[in-house]
Regions:
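Zymogen propeptides
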Residues: 2-151, 167-168
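Extracytoplasmic
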Residues: 80-82, 92, 118-120, 153-155, ...
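Short acidic-glycine loop/turn motifs at beta-strand connectors
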Residues: 88-91, 160-166, 197, 222-226, ...
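Short, solvent-exposed aromatic-acidic interface loops
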Residues: 100-105, 172-176, 233-237
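Structural recognition of the beta-strand scaffold that forms the well-ordered cores
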Residues: 122-126, 157-160, 167, 221, ...
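Conserved, well-ordered active-site substructure
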Residues: 134-152, 205-258, 268-300
Length: 300
């Protein structure tokens, strides 16, 4: 009788342990914030942003002040609604990044529009959604938050330097600390690169599962010093099919970019400008924003 009681007790304890472990795993994946580090100092200069906004000239498709000029145009490419943003800044300091909830950590997310508004962004798009992965460098505002090499480093990362220049780097070739020493301020790890040295780096026959698929897209490129372009496309709807990576690269090249890089796309693709969402983000078949880990933005 004692044997059965002991066996029952052990079984019950083991079952409770398994249940607790499974429950925690589910919570960690879908619920718990698991904030690793709160970013105490934001780079946003609220006073400067308010001053600039007060004197800026704005329309539905443009923004202009003494330091920042933004022009938005829309066009149809391959049955897809595409938004092109031309950006000129007086200093690379106005090209910025921000974490959702001003916090670095897995499962810490917010809609692009919310993070943008919290940082007084003039223009913003979703970033690389670093929180969806457990590996890959995370460098923001010159701080290394994660230094483990991404599982697939062949895609390359977009390194943004203090002077505003872009370079495609590969994590298995250089450490995160060395990148910061070399002047990297922000690093975006999604990919792949679309254009390097003015030439398209993807083709219609490579990465068929990704390049040939029509999807919403977000990409950023550099034309010249302090002159950038952001392209966002809608997709997955009857009105807008979406772009392949090659088609996205073609759009970028047509604007004369030297380097262009593919950011997180699909349901994450969101364009925020002058206080509102411009495109039509799709999440689970509906027009709505997806919460993401981070944004790239123009602002003070």
């Amino acid at each position: 009788m004692k044997f059965f009681k002991k066996s029952y007790t052990y079984a019950a304890c083991f079952g409770l342990l398994l249940t607790s472990s499974f429950s925690y795993s589910i919570l960690k994946t879908f619920v718990l914030s698991d904030a690793i580090q709160t970013v105490k100092a934001t780079t946003t200069d609220t006073k400067a942003a308010k001053k600039a906004a007060a004197s800026a000239t704005t329309t539905d498709t443009s923004y202009s002040d003494d330091n920042i000029q933004v022009t938005l145009t829309e066009k149809t490419v391959e049955n897809t609604q595409v938004y092109i943003v031309d950006i000129t800044v007086s200093s690379a300091d106005y090209l910025k990044t921000a974490f959702a909830q001003n916090t670095y950590g897995t499962n810490v997310t917010a809609k692009t529009s919310v993070t943008a508004a919290n940082n007084s962004a003039i223009l913003a798009v979703n970033g690389d959604y670093y929180g969806a992965n457990s590996t890959g460098y995370v460098i923001r505002n010159g701080v290394v938050y994660r230094d483990t090499v991404r599982e697939d480093s062949s895609n390359g990362d977009l390194a943004i330097y203090k002077d505003g220049s872009f370079k495609i780097i590969y994590e298995d070739e250089i450490s995160a600390d060395q990148l910061v020493k070399d002047g990297v301020v922000n690093l975006l790890a999604f990919g792949p690169s679309l254009v390097e040295n003015g030439e398209i780096t993807v083709d219609t026959n490579s990465e068929v599962g990704r390049s040939m698929a029509s999807n919403p897209r977000t990409a950023i490129g550099i034309i010249d010093e302090n002159h950038y372009i952001i392209v966002v496309s809608d997709g997955r709807t009857s009105e807008s099919e979406g772009l392949s990576l090659y088609q996205l690269a073609e759009v970028m090249k047509s604007y004369g970019v030297k380097t262009a890089y593919n950011l997180d796309g699909g349901g994450s693709s969101t364009l925020y400008f002058n206080g509102q969402v411009i495109n039509k983000p799709t999440t689970n078949g509906t027009i709505s924003e997806r919460a993401v880990s981070d944004i790239v933005y123009i602002g003070y």
